[in-house]
């Protein structure tokens, strides 16, 4: 319960970087100033898709525990489209994203992903983000173009590693929602959790 409350507070803090009392130079371009001098958050009244695991799953713990997206819904009037399922790992993000697209099309303003704790618990190897090679390319910076050696990074799409799964998930999200804001939240810190005789993590 404490970790979920801490998570909700962290998200609220992250999303509330546009509070009252900011000077003119720090105001966000898409925000609107209200009559009392406060800044209206750019996500006010928006439609947000939530992908994840039990921390996001609306069916996990029923009405006993408010989820982080419940707090954002109350605070900002967000319409939540929630697709998190308990126990899922990063390799489920493409499926959740496709379901979001199927049911809501382009009618989503942003997507939040909170995932990874189950990958860690399952011992999924971390892996690498990309391979790096050198290539000869034509380039110019304030002078006539010439052949230069440049480094090229290619994302590793490896479904057996944590970083590879993230690359695959983000790639699919960008294909489905190329012009939408995507927010990644890091996994929560894990410690011993004894949920019963057959569920100790």
Predicted regions and their residues:
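Compositionally biased, intrinsically disordered low-complexity segments
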Residues: 1, 14-17, 31, 35, ...
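Bacterial Sec-dependent N-terminal signal peptides
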Residues: 1-25
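Alpha-helical transmembrane segments and their juxtamembrane interfaces
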Residues: 12-14, 63, 191
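Serine-esterase "nucleophile elbow" of acetyl-processing enzymes
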Residues: 21-86, 97-106
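Active-site-proximal beta-strand/loop segments in catalytic clefts of secreted hydrolases
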Residues: 51-54, 83-88, 114-117, 185-189
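Alpha-helical cap/lid subdomain in secreted, periplasmic
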Residues: 75, 96-201
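N-terminal beta-loop-helix "entrance" segment that forms/cooperates
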Residues: 91-92
